[in-house]
Design a protein with these regions (language model features):
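Helix-to-coil/beta transition segments that act as allosteric "coupling" elements at the rims
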Residues: 74-100
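GAF sensory/regulatory domain recognition
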Residues: 16-47
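Short, hydrophobic-rich beta-strand element in sensory/regulatory alpha-beta domains
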Residues: 3-6, 12-20, 26, 52
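Amphipathic alpha-helical regulatory segments at dimerization interfaces
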Residues: 1-8, 50-53, 57, 77-78, ...
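Acidic/proline- and glycine-rich, intrinsically disordered low-complexity segments
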Residues: 36-69, 119-122
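Regulatory loop-to-helix N-cap segments in sensory/regulatory domains
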Residues: 106-124, 130-139
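Short beta-strand-to-loop transition segments that serve as allosteric relay/switch motifs
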Residues: 31-34, 101-111
Length: 139
């Protein structure tokens, strides 16, 4: 699963949310290292400028003390409650430019090394390739 891949990449907490275009929301699909209620999380993109931006096209955002003040108020309260701390990665994954899921991950709030961020990015690319291959097979 995507969560297992992220755990193998060193992320101690992760949340994978799928885009539900009919309901215009993100729905939690997989979670690791988070409270049980994380599995029931739904996010409304219109409530967060950061989430809206990430859903426009596949992209990555690294939150750390230097930019946390800028972005914290723009994050959904549900995510802030689950991922307390100043070190967080958010990445939207997609196929052919269309975003299908949002991944949120960290190392229990600890600072992320550049190597950890690169590993997260590479793992995310692998998940995207798998999504693309799965989609071509017709589901």
């Amino acid at each position: 699963t995507a969560s297992q891949a992220l755990t193998s990449a060193g992320m101690q907490r992760s949340l994978v949310l799928l885009v539900d275009r009919k309901q215009n929301r993100l729905v939690a699909q997989q979670c690791v290292g988070l409270p049980g209620d994380a599995a029931r999380l739904t996010l409304a993109p219109e409530q967060s400028q950061v989430v809206r931006r990430l859903l426009e096209k596949p992209a990555q955002l690294r939150l750390q003390p230097a930019n946390m003040a800028q972005f914290s108020a723009l994050l959904p309260s549900g995510l802030k409650a689950l991922f307390a701390g100043e070190h967080l990665l958010l990445r939207s994954l997609g196929v052919d430019g269309r975003v299908l899921m949002l991944v949120v991950a960290d190392q229990n709030g600890a600072p992320l090394s550049d190597a950890s961020v690169q590993t997260f990015a590479k793992t995310s690319q692998c998940i995207e390739r798998a999504l693309s291959l799965f989609g071509r097979r017709g589901g």
